UniProtKB/Swiss-Prot annotation:
Domain of life: Viruses
TM region positions: none
Basic and acidic residues bias (residue ranges): 80-91
Protein location: Host nucleus, Host nucleolus
Organism whose genome encodes this protein: Human herpesvirus 1 (strain F) (HHV-1)
Region (Disordered) location: 27-107
Keyword Hydrolase: no
Keyword annotations of the record: Host nucleus
Matching InterPro entries: Herpes_US8A
Name of the molecule in the record: US8.5 protein
A GO CC term assigned to this protein in UniProt: host cell nucleolus
Length: 151
């Protein structure tokens, strides 16, 4: 076996979570859908222009956005003031009842498939790689025996 490939397989076996003594299923906490909703404060929103206002500049009225020169930060502040505090009757990532503006392809379902994903079997991939390499070499040897040159 190629020394680099042997080293790769040794490291692969060495650093898997099971080899390191970590039981991933036991370390994960079960999800509680009735649990408390975690609400974190949003970071302060600053104007997106990046420039501090000039000290002698006149203060703008709250209605100055009608001129069309509002920054992104000011737009976000206005939207958050307009919406008010967050609602606590549903989780933040719950789906709304409004239909999606983007049509879904036929056969699309939002339900997760109950079929578990299969783990990648590294030894079988290695055997397939060896078989492909052998076939490539055998075809090259056969072509050279017949008298054909490399294409």
């Amino acid at each position: 076996m190629d020394p680099a490939l042997r080293s790769y397989h040794q490291r692969l076996r060495l650093y898997t979570p099971v080899a390191m003594g970590i039981n991933l299923a036991a370390s994960s906490q079960p999800l509680d859908p009735e649990g408390p909703i975690a609400v974190t404060p949003r970071p302060p929103i600053r104007p997106s222009s990046g420039k501090a206002p000039h000290p002698e500049a006149p203060r703008r009225s709250p209605n100055w956005a009608t001129a069309g020169e509002v920054d992104v930060g000011d737009e976000l502040i206005a939207i958050s003031d307009e919406r008010g505090p967050p609602r606590h009757d549903r989780p933040p990532l719950a789906t709304s009842t409004a239909p999606s503006p983007h049509p879904r392809p036929p056969g699309y379902t939002a339900v997760v498939s109950p079929m578990a994903l299969q783990a990648v079997d590294a030894p079988s991939l290695f055997v397939a790689w060896l078989a492909a390499r052998w076939l490539r070499g055998a075809s090259g040897l056969g072509a050279s025996c017949v008298g054909l040159r490399g294409m």
